[in-house]
Amino acid sequence: MLCLPVFIILLLLVSPAATMPVDLEILKAPTKESRKDFEMRIELLRSKRQCCRPANMSCCQG
């Protein structure tokens, strides 16, 4: 009889812990997208830095 309440308490403690990784994955998704945007922005800045030379200023306009 003593095992049943202990089992119920353990079951209640384990149930919320099982859903936590799903919540964390939802929170990670926007972070992955913003990292991708950040990398694209860095690539754009690098290409502009390489392109913008005094001899070739026409590509700096965009």
From Swiss-Prot:
Task: List the GO terms this entry assigns under cellular component, sorted alphabetically.
Answer: extracellular region
Main location as per UniProt: secreted
**According to its UniProt record, in which tissues is this protein expressed?**
Expressed by the venom duct.
Name the domain of life this protein comes from: Eukaryota
Q: Where in the cell is it found?
A: Secreted
Question: Where are the Pyrrolidone carboxylic acid residues found in this chain?
Answer: Q50
Q: Which family does it belong to?
A: Belongs to the conotoxin T superfamily.
Present the record's domain note.
The cysteine framework is V (CC-CC).
**Can you say what this protein is called?**
Conotoxin Lt5.8
